[in-house]
């Protein structure tokens, strides 16, 4: 979900930070990856090996803050694409927005959730 003015704000933020290669909209994730697992044969292991003792059992408030890129807006310098042959570069500037504006649409159910979120913030009226 992209509120009015977000594109202009993102371009402005990138222009104000000449050492940044790009800007990406992010938000706090609904699930912390420090509490996620991956399958390793018959067993599971933590997705991230952080060195934090039993990180999967720690309160999320004590874990490092992470952000989820939600695809709402990416602003990229042409020099990043041409010179670095990258869509993000090495220095990505965050633009943190409310997670209520995150919409990951993969199926009809997630589309309905996104439509409800749009209505709740006044989009489409």
Q: Which residue ranges define each predicted feature?
A:
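Conserved alpha/beta core of the MobA/IspD/sugar-nucleotide pyrophosphorylase nucleotidyltransferase superfamily
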Residues: 65-125
């Amino acid at each position: 979900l992209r509120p009015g003015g977000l594109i202009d704000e993102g371009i402005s933020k990138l222009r104000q930070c000449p050492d940044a290669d790009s800007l990406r909209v992010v938000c706090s994730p609904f699930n912390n990856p420090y509490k996620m697992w991956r399958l390793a044969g018959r067993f599971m292991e933590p997705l991230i090996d952080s060195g934090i003792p039993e990180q999967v059992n720690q309160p999320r408030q004590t874990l490092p803050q992470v952000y989820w890129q939600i695809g709402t807006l990416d602003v990229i310098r042409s020099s990043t694409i041409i010179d670095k042959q990258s869509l993000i570069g090495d220095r990505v500037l965050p633009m943190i927005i409310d997670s209520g504006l995150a919409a990951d649409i993969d199926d009809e159910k997630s589309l309905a959730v996104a439509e409800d979120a749009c209505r709740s913030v006044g989009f489409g009226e």
